[in-house]
Amino acid sequence: YIVPSTGRAENMQPPQIEAEKRIRYYITSGGARVVDHSTGEIIHEEILTPEDSARMCRVFEGRNIYTEIAAGGKIYLEKAVADHLEQYPVPSHHVWFIEAGRQIVIDKPSRYFSENGIGIEKVNMYGIPAGLQQQIYDEVEHSGVAHITDPVGENMQFFPQGLDRTRGIRKL
């Protein structure tokens, strides 16, 4: 088998990857999930708890930041942002995904993940205003549950603290 190991969520794999029959397993979201694509079985998962997911959503929620939230193999967008995507810096290599309508739009991410008992795999934030960059970085880094893998800047992503891609590879 070919096993792609990527930062993308499962449903954000390009159609060319999904169509490749030799690809049975995905290592997704930087190692947060290992999935048997043919059966849907989750082989390995390192995610935030639903409560920690809700807390981390409050870091960006309502701040008009284009944010992709990966959870359960899917990408979620905050409705207030999704309703006006033309105003946000959607990465060019993600446009196909948005145009295909594969994202799930939710009103208030913190409430949604808490009420539905869903844990987050990772979060990508794009176009963070300069005045919020350090604050968001500090909030995530001092949360005790998540870690930003990028330097302070307009684009940052975070994962569950302690995530180790090699654990998923070894389990597979």
Across the structure, where does each feature detected by a protein language model lie?
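Conserved acidic, metal-coordinating active-site core of Asp-based
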Residues: 59, 63, 70-172
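Active-site phosphate-binding/coordination module
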Residues: 1-91
